[in-house]
From Swiss-Prot:
Any one of the GO CC terms: cytoplasm
Protein name: Clustered mitochondria protein homolog
Region (Disordered): 78-110, 979-1015
Hydrolase is among the record's keywords: no
Biological-process GO terms, alphabetical: intracellular distribution of mitochondria; mitochondrion organization
Keyword Repeat among record annotations: yes
Main location: cytoplasm
InterPro entries in the cross-refs: CLU-central (IPR033646), CLU_dom (IPR025697), CLU_N (IPR028275), CLU_prot (IPR027523), GSKIP_dom_sf (IPR023231), TPR-like_helical_dom_sf (IPR011990)
Organism: Brugia malayi
């Protein structure tokens, strides 16, 4: 799809030379929808990669707007002479910072797959949403993808673009040709010049055609005289003050382009990446280097310590081009100099020790004659030349600057584009190295002047009106796909800017630190409110006792989260006439700050006068409006909110009808827009945590309702949606049952027969399954507590749907339909049974105010029934959602690696974190889920500590913050920390490499506290642990018996390093990068105050999504699951293009797209393209999710797999070592995903004949398989077989025989004695026995002859396996199975056919699309997450034969 024709706001992602993207001329900003909509430079990224195809790929002809071409340009890494370094080039073996990006199938002129047909199976799980809503434009794309052939082209909904070539001539640079399309704008050509190395230092210029300047926002097709071969000239323009400051900042950013301080400090969208520091350019020739393949000690199985130094890349020696470049204190130019063209004065300190004073005039920059003695702005006699570029001037006066700048630009050009693009939301690292602070006058100006907001040099007017921008983008047209893309991009960009402004400027530097004057300074500090940069800020305290009866400060803290959930819910509905405020919740230094956009006119009148809907006094009086009633009726239906009536509370005694909670306020702003705010009661309360509420019998048996710190606990939207869907299915089944009883007696008999057969099948599965049913039955019994539940006989869902469809069809046909009265009776029974508010249809809704005591409900409201429905929803969470989550963990449909992935998984199922204790109790005795228990308890303890830390840190002064935080960490992670006193000897004790002076300084700071609050120093390990235990019981109903944290962590198996990482992440502490040796068990002090590098903000906000792109992505996943890989690939590729046009080039959702594209490319026979896509996905995950996030670990494993497929063998091992290290760091050794990593490492080490190391990893993989998977699983058999081969290569045939016997036992039990796989294992046993006998004979012969020749005793045959056979085993371990088909069956039951894989090589890894699409996907419940399709499954033989086990699973990872 031609993105430029649809959005013109896409950030292009080809790997070329880019300048920093945080500062661009305002003229390069995209035309705003209204005059008050200024955007920063990131918005102005070019819309389409095809603009640069002549540079990147050297292509002249061909379509430039197809999605393939757009993505083709995204992965190219060019050398300085413009030649591509692909894995197939002879010179590609050199070390490089990124894997070589191969050509895509289109660039290689790829044709349809060859003659060999393959069926591809993935053994990973992925749960897809059950409902898929695709708009008409997406349906067109979906249909287009279905109709395409092997070329994979997807129809573009936009008009086709004419392409032509132009020549650009720039001062001081060689002319170059550029291929463009007619729909691009002139500003995109400006961006090309800012990205080229020869012109990247020019910012103030215009493009001219035949002497006429071109407008930035004019499309090329509208320029008269611009044709193929036209010449555009870059003409330097006069500087203004604004243009001069922009130019200086741009040069400063070029100079600092290698500086990592922004990434470490978490500013300007910068974040760290590790992948670029790894050498991925090696080839097969490096595989024999022992040094390259040997694992570091800290990743070996059994290594106890978790060093932190390897987490971050090794910092290179910084390249310093200058000492300082700053705005001169002689600014502004005096009047007489302004009249002569002076614009700005600068000072420049060189590395040679000289200072130059520089004047910027309208013509450019020159050195003036100013000295320390006085101001002389006239040109210097020794440097009279005026340079239009500041970079040229600095290079002419300083040789060291010129040399350093050349090196900086060279290294900058070697960086992958994804390393330099800003992330949409700031990603902070929890650990950081020490950086030496260097002079930076511009940074000092930005960060020390309280009146600056950081945007003055970027926008052409006053400070931004955030509310107007947010609401204007909301009102943009959305009828066509192109309009929706423009709108979604604008919404996303404005929102990300709003979040950045709320965090960067106002919280960390202003509100919490006291740098902003409150609008109510005379009030108590905790009630202060602020306005800064057109954003309203308030603290999360109970102001004026508004929440006194609901829990005080705890309720006020929870209300902000509930309010954000409501804003997110209404924003997703996207009602064009209903507006919500921009909202960001920031937690910083123990304070919660809420940032909101400001409704026009809200500050000009009293709140009582502004609110025309809802209540301003907590329900005592309520008002309503017909306008708001109409506006909220549809959202109430979508959000399952019950319209209800309440008393107005006024003397008139009116009854008011509400379509929301009474807390929701409706305000019409001065802009005539209808706003809703205070959405904290959008969803019904969680009665399990509402004291004195009436709950169901099952909930009572589980100890509910429980006392909670506040009364604002509410159910999540995901739970409401799941509950309503569950009740709808129940409604269908009940109605179908009554229809069956009334009219379809015969069908009932047939159905019962079918049900008996189904039950029989289920019984077989229970017998052969992996005790999952027994575990779930035990959990169900524990939940229900043997309470008898009255259940109506129900039909199975599919049978019920079939019956109801037949009834509906018969009604339409007016043939043999049910009597109308009978139908109404049936519907009424079903509706009553599920709690529907209507008797003639399904309509389940909740009254969010049914438990509110401050509002008086109308007598017509059935409050008892409404409360019962809310209680049943809370029971649904206990009875259905929690057990289903446990089942998903048992089936490994979700893979939890750390607390963040646990929280995401729980929230996606509507489970609140307060149920973490209940979940932990359910799984504490389930051995297969011991790793989940560790993650749950770690998260539980960290959240308890966070609750305490919040109140602990608030009263601490700024001077003692580091000391207080380090003391808290010492108390939390050790059992022997005592309160701090000035005489405490422990304070002055040196810790490891920490100097004594550091601790002495700390003691002085503590003792000099004087009148300041020093309660924090009285904390001790014992006090903190007792509070954590109490908090765990109070919040989570989880009991801890151990007397100290050391004993408890040891009992549960929690690493202190993992615990520290998770805690500092959720509270926003940045630690010093050093090895703390927490696992050594030392009793001394663990942390000192210098270990606390910084505190950063934790932000919660709405995350706008690319709706059309997401729908396409889900459609692509569905196609892949159906076996239509090419169609799925096309849809996912198109989805990536749409995301690119909405998000720009950097977003975590795009990383998921690229991961799926990489897998599909690999399966479709293009491993080089798979490597390219996976490399980008890994880089993006590191930047957007974090260096050690769960997603990043998975990306590393996939990248290692595809690197090995491209013969980057040593690189594959490095990536696997990195993945293993990260998993060790965030969790530890005992995790099922570690078995997968270790299996991969062991296989590759076996391939490079590192047998000793291979054994360590394979043995650990086997141990983990036996714990977390069924010991008789097929993957376990494969590990046994690999161990047998490895032992045999070491000459240990006795152990090898034992391993292969285990393989034989598993196969014989699974397949039977006569199965080919069992016979193959039997043959292997015979072969090993023969080798063992021969080996023993040689030993005996050597003993008899007294020979010391070790070479005679080596194993008889050690064949190095082919790389292809090793790759096949890796495929199996990573869930990708290739099956070669000798014939294509048209039968839907492929289980009836036998397909056998013969010997293959890498050149035969192509599949026919038709072969895949003709095969039906079939699943049954075999163990080890696999389903046997063929009756002749086989396991790969590492010695060279190339047979592959024939298995299948659900398609996606």
């Amino acid at each position: 799809m031609c993105v430029c024709a649809c959005a013109r706001v896409c950030v292009y992602v080809c790997t070329r030379h880019h300048p920093p993207l945080d500062v661009f001329p305002a003229d390069d900003v995209i035309t705003p929808p209204c005059s008050s909509w200024p955007l920063r430079g990131v918005m102005s990224r070019p819309a389409c990669q095809c603009l640069r195809r002549c540079e990147v790929m050297g292509e002249v002809n061909g379509p430039v707007c197809s999605p393939e071409i757009v993505l083709a340009s995204a992965g190219k890494t060019l050398s300085e002479n413009g030649q591509e370094n692909s894995p197939h080039n002879s010179d590609s073996g050199h070390e490089t910072s990124s894997p070589d990006s191969p050509l895509t199938p289109i660039e290689e002129g790829a044709v349809s797959p060859g003659d060999d047909s393959f069926f591809v199976v993935w053994i990973k799980f992925m749960v897809l949403p059950r409902k898929l809503c695709i708009n008409k434009d997406v349906e067109k794309l979906f249909s287009a993808a279905e109709k395409t052939g092997n070329d994979g082209e997807v129809l573009c909904p936009s008009d086709e673009c004419d392409t032509f070539r132009i020549r650009i001539i720039a001062p001081g640079a060689e002319p170059f040709d550029l291929q463009v399309n007619s729909n691009e704008m002139v500003q995109e050509l400006h961006q090309v010049l800012l990205e080229r190395e020869a012109t990247c230092h020019r910012t103030c210029f215009s493009l001219q055609l035949n002497g006429v300047s071109l407008d930035h926002f004019t499309e090329l097709k509208n320029i008269s005289g611009l044709t193929d071969g036209s010449v555009l000239r870059v003409v330097e323009q006069p500087y203004t003050t604004r243009e001069a400051r922009i130019h200086v900042r741009h040069i400063r950013d070029l100079i600092r382009s290698l500086d990592m301080s922004d990434a470490v400090n978490g500013t300007d969208g910068a974040s760290m990446s590790y992948l670029a520091s790894m050498t991925l350019g090696d080839r097969k020739k490096n595989a024999d280097k022992t040094l390259e393949c040997s694992p570091p000690d800290y990743v070996l199985p059994g290594y106890k310590e978790r060093p932190l130094i390897p987490l971050l890349p090794v910092m290179k020696e910084p390249v310093l081009a200058l000492k300082s470049l700053a705005i001169s204190p002689f600014n502004p130019p005096p009047g007489h100099r302004k009249l002569k063209g002076d614009v700005l004065y600068l000072t420049f300190d060189t590395r040679e020790g000289r200072r130059y004073h520089i004047t910027c005039c309208t013509k450019g920059f020159y050195v003036n004659a100013t000295t320390e003695a006085g101001f002389r702005p006239t040109p210097s006699p020794s440097h009279r030349t005026v340079h239009h570029s500041l970079l040229d001037l600095l290079s002419s006066i300083s040789i060291s600057f010129k040399r350093a700048m050349a090196l900086i630009l060279k290294r900058r050009s070697e960086k992958h584009i994804f390393e330099r693009l800003p992330t949409p939301y700031q990603v902070n690292s929890w650990i950081a190295p020490v950086f030496e602070q260097i002079e930076d006058g511009i940074r000092a100006e930005d960060c020390t002047q309280p009146h600056k907001i950081g945007l003055e040099d970027h926008i052409p007017g006053q400070i931004r009106d955030w509310n107007e921008e947010l609401q204007t983008t909301h009102e943009l047209p959305r009828e066509t796909l192109g309009e929706r893309l423009i709108r979604e991009r604008a919404i996303f960009k404005i929102h990300s800017d709003f979040v950045s402004a709320a965090i960067k400027v106002n919280v960390s530097m202003a509100v919490v630190d006291g740098n902003v004057v409150a609008i109510n300074p005379a009030d108590e500090p905790r009630t202060h409110m602020y306005i800064w940069n057109n954003i309203f800020f308030s603290l999360g305290f109970d102001v004026k006792d508004h929440y006194k009866d609901l829990g005080g400060d705890a309720a006020a803290h929870a209300a902000t989260s509930n309010d954000l959930q409501g804003v997110r819910a209404y924003a997703q509905l996207d009602n064009p006439k209903l507006f919500t405020l921009g909202m960001v919740i920031v937690d910083y230094k123990g304070f919660r700050v809420t940032a909101q956009s400001i409704i026009p006119g809200i500050l000009e009148r009293e709140q009582e006068q502004s609110v025309i809907y809802g209540s301003v006094d907590f329900g005592k009086t309520v008002v309503s409006s017909e306008e708001y009633h109409d506006l909220l009726s549809k959202p109430a239906e979508q959000l399952k909110i019950l319209p209800h009536e309440v008393h107005s509370g006024k003397d008139d005694g009116k009854i008011i009808k509400l379509c929301s909670s009474f807390e929701t306020k409706g305000i019409v702003g001065n802009d005539s827009r209808h706003y809703i705010l205070d959405l904290l009661r959008t969803f019904p309360p969680d009665v399990n945590y509402l004291e004195d509420a009436e709950v169901t019998d099952i909930c009572k048996a589980n100890g509910y309702p429980r006392t909670f710190p506040h009364k604002l606990a509410s159910l999540r939207q995901e739970l409401i949606d799941a509950f309503v869907e569950y009740r709808y299915l129940m409604f269908i089944r009940i109605a179908a049952y009554h229809v069956q009883q009334t009219k379809l007696g015969l069908l009932e008999t047939d159905y019962n027969d079918d049900k008996k057969e189904t039950t029989k099948e289920d019984t077989v599965l229970k017998v052969t399954g992996f005790s999952e049913d027994a575990i779930m039955s035990q959990i169900k019994r524990e939940i229900t507590a043997d309470i008898k539940i009255d259940e109506m006989p129900l039909l199975e869902t599919e049978a019920a749907k079939k019956i109801m469809e037949e009834v509906i069809d018969s009604d339409h046909k007016k043939v043999d339909s049910l009597d109308k009265e009978i139908s109404e009776t049936i519907m009424a029974k079903a509706a009553k049974a599920v709690g529907s508010i209507r008797m003639d249809a399904f309509d389940v809704r909740f009254n969010p105010d049914c438990y509110c005591s401050t509002v008086r409900h109308a007598e017509s409201e059935d409050i008892t029934k409404q409360r019962r429905l809310v209680a049943e929803a809370a029971e649904f969470l206990i009875v259905q959602q929690l057990p289903n989550f446990v089942r998903d963990c048992l089936q490994r449909t979700i893979m939890l690696l750390d607390g963040a992935s646990l929280i995401d998984s729980l929230h996606s199922r509507g489970i609140n974190i307060r149920y973490l204790g209940k979940l932990t109790k359910y799984i504490q005795n389930v051995g297969q889920l011991s790793y989940v228990k560790v993650i749950c308890i770690t998260e539980l303890l960290c959240r308890c500590a966070k609750h305490i830390f919040r109140g602990y840190l608030q009263p601490v002064s700024s001077a003692h913050t580091a000391a207080a935080v380090s003391h808290f960490l010492n108390c939390l992670l050790s059992s022997s920390t005592e309160p701090l006193t000035p005489s405490n000897e422990e304070v002055s004790m040196p810790i490891n490499s920490v100097k004594k002076s550091r601790s002495s300084k700390r003691r002085k700071q503590i003792s000099s506290g004087g009148k300041e609050n020093d309660d924090w120093a009285q904390m001790s390990s014992h006090k903190l642990w007792e509070r954590v235990k109490s908090d765990a019981d109070f919040y989570y109903a989880f009991t801890i018996d151990e007397e100290n944290i050391d004993a408890y962590l040891s009992t549960v198996g929690i690493q202190k390093t993992s615990f520290l990482r998770r805690f500092v992440q959720i509270v926003g502490i940045q630690m010093l990068l050093r090895d703390y040796n927490l696992e050594s068990g030392k009793k001394s002090q663990l942390f000192v105050e210098d270990d606390i590098q910084s505190l950063y903000c934790q932000a919660k906000h709405v995350d706008p999504k690319a709706v059309d792109a997401h729908s396409l992505f889900l459609s692509g996943q569905t196609k892949v699951q159906q076996g239509q890989l090419r169609a799925g690939f096309d849809l996912v590729l198109e989805s990536l293009n749409l995301m690119n046009s909405v998000y720009g080039a950097m977003h975590s959702d795009m990383a998921q797209c690229m991961r799926l594209l990489a897998r599909l490319s690999y399966i479709l026979g293009d491993p080089s393209e798979a490597l390219s896509q996976q490399h980008k996905a890994t880089l993006m995950s590191e930047r957007c999710n974090g260096l050690d996030s769960a997603n990043t670990i998975i990306e590393y494993l996939n990248l290692a797999h595809f690197s090995f497929a491209n013969l980057h063998i040593a690189a594959a091992l490095k990536l696997l070592y990195r993945a293993r290290y990260l998993l060790l760091l965030i969790h530890g050794e005992n995790h099922p995903f570690m078995a997968e990593i270790d299996g991969n490492i062991g296989v590759i080490l076996y391939a490079v004949q590192e047998f000793d190391d291979a054994l360590k990893f394979l043995q650990n993989a086997l141990k983990l398989h036996q714990i977390y998977l069924e010991p008789q699983a097929l993957k376990t058999a494969l590990i046994y077989h690999l161990l047998a081969r490895t032992y045999s290569c070491r000459g240990d045939f006795r152990t090898a025989l034992q391993m292969e016997k285990e393989t034989f036992t598993i196969y014989s039990k699974t397949f039977g004695i006569d199965h080919e796989k069992t016979k193959e294992s039997s043959d292997c046993l015979k072969h090993l026995t023969q080798q063992a006998v021969t080996f023993q004979k040689r030993i005996n012969e050597a003993n008899r002859q007294g020979s010391n020749n070790i070479g005679q005793l080596l194993p008889v045959e050690i064949h190095r396996p082919s790389l292809h056979s090793v790759l096949e085993v890796l495929n199996i371990l990573n869930g990708i199975i290739f099956i070669q088909l000798k014939g294509i069956s048209t039968s839907s039951d492929i289980g009836e056919e036998n397909y056998e894989l013969g010997n293959n090589n890498n050149n035969n890894n192509k599949r026919k699309k038709k072969a895949v699409e003709d095969l039906a996907v079939k699943k049954n419940g075999n163990n080890d997450d696999t389903t046997v399709i063929s009756s002749r499954p086989q396991v790969n033989n590492m010695s060279g034969s190339s047979t592959v086990q024939v298995m299948q699973e659900v398609a996606l990872d």
